[in-house]
Amino acid sequence: MTALSAAPLRAQVGYDPPSSPYRDLRQTQELTFFSGYFRAKADPARVAPQSGPIFGALYQWRPSGPMHLNVSVSRVSSERRVLDPDLPGTCSGVPAGDCKLIDTFQWPLYFIDGGLALALTGARSFYHLVPEVKLGAGVATDFHSQADVGQFQFGTRFAFNWGAGIRWVPGGAFQVRADLSNHLYAVKYPGTYYVPAPDKSVIFTNTQSQTAWLNNPSITIGISYLFSR
């Protein structure tokens, strides 16, 4: 009698499918439109594109299991300072250190990224949530092919990216996702920043490296359309 009663008890271990917190993810692809804020790190000369709102689109595909492939395009509504190394180092009526500043200009910054994302709950959600970690690479560009008056050019440069996110998948064809990301890229200063002006002032002395690596975090929220082939 005891042996017969043990079998149904063993069958009850775990969750009944209707009450389980796990749900299989049926769709394998998503198209997300997102917006948020890009927090640019100030470079030593403060001439790189600055912080601003960011928006863009993300395509993500899950070929199998927890692994995802993704590609995204985004735009930052940024500004950038333009310096003239030939201007005098001392002046009146402007903040200290800004005597060589010509002006601050609207300067949009664009990212084209590709990478991998790993869903920590596998090919399913946990209480409708899917946490992710991601890693990738791409380019950052301002689409300017010529240097400014001070010979500085941001141009197009290689950028690493990584971060984490969480997806809320309530069921159906839509989801909401939030992501915390970081872009790492370098800016390079021209030789003119180290050449004395007529008054012997310089933007940089030789102790400042010509290359500065910048970490630039961003936080975004997006709405996704989910689908499969």
Regions found by a protein language model. Give the residues of each.
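Solvent-exposed loop segments that connect transmembrane elements
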Residues: 13, 23, 81-102, 187-209
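Extracellular loop and loop/strand-boundary signature of outer-membrane beta-barrel proteins
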Residues: 18-19, 41-45, 96-105, 145-153, ...
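Short glycine/proline- and aromatic-enriched beta-strand/turn motifs that initiate or cap beta-hairpins
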Residues: 11-63, 142-144, 203, 218-229
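Transmembrane beta-barrel outer-membrane domains
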Residues: 24-28, 46-52, 103-111, 151-159, ...
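Gram-negative (and chloroplast) outer-membrane scaffold detector with strong preference
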Residues: 58-149, 157, 170, 216-229
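Predominantly the C-terminal beta-signal and adjacent terminal strand-loop region
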Residues: 171-229
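Transmembrane beta-barrel strands of outer-membrane/channel proteins
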Residues: 33-37, 71-75, 133-141, 166, ...
